[in-house]
Amino acid sequence: MKTAHLVVVVCFLAGALQTAVALKEEDCEVCVKTVRRFADSLDDTTKKDYRKIETSFKKFCSGQKNKEHRFCYYLGGLEESATGILNELSKPLSWSMPAEKICEKLKKKDAQICDLRYEKQIDLNSVDLKKLKVRDLKKILNDWDESCDGCLEKSDFIKRIEELKPKYAHGEL
């Protein structure tokens, strides 16, 4: 009887750990959103055949731009793609696997798939600069074509943005 309880507890803990480690949409946003949008564009007969899914994905990719285009390149959905792991998308889609799980599998094959990120639009009037990551602070300065020579700490970047804010954010006020 104790062994049965122990097995149940171990299974529960393993399930809880897997849920905690599961990929979130924001961890792999371009992949998840692109896979969802592509899956929603498929009809029921196409969804059942992985070969039709691959053909449809190549057509889908031909009309993509920016981050989605790069995602297609990584998967092998473009003619100029150097590698092809398209079956890692098409077969799970034919099994009705959720986009998050598909992207989790794709990340294991090629980690740069989840490195793709959409550009964040930052409202300088309402955002607390202290809560932003350093890369976002650098992006603000880069968008303004400004640099921060000698900036090492987050506080240095924040100070530089605060100095330049009147010059660049006047249209947003």
From Swiss-Prot:
Gene3D superfamilies from the UniProt entry = SAP domain, Saposin-like
Question: Where is it located?
Answer: Secreted
Note the SUPFAM superfamilies from the entry: SAP domain
Q: Which GO terms describe its cellular component?
A: endoplasmic reticulum; extracellular space; synapse
Origin superkingdom: Eukaryota
Q: Does the keyword Membrane apply?
A: no
Q: Which GO terms describe its biological process?
A: dopamine metabolic process; dopaminergic neuron differentiation; neuron cellular homeostasis; neuron projection development; synaptic transmission, dopaminergic
Disulfide-bond pairs as recorded: 28-114, 31-103, 61-72, 148-151
Instruction: Read off the PANTHER family from this record.
Output: ARMET-LIKE PROTEIN (PTHR12990), MESENCEPHALIC ASTROCYTE-DERIVED NEUROTROPHIC FACTOR HOMOLOG (PTHR12990:SF5)
Family to which this protein belongs: Belongs to the ARMET family.
Role summary: Required during the maturation of the embryonic nervous system for maintenance of neuronal and cuticular connectivity. Essential for maintenance of dopaminergic neurons and dopamine levels.
Record protein name field: Mesencephalic astrocyte-derived neurotrophic factor homolog
Q: Which organism is it from?
A: Drosophila ananassae (Fruit fly)
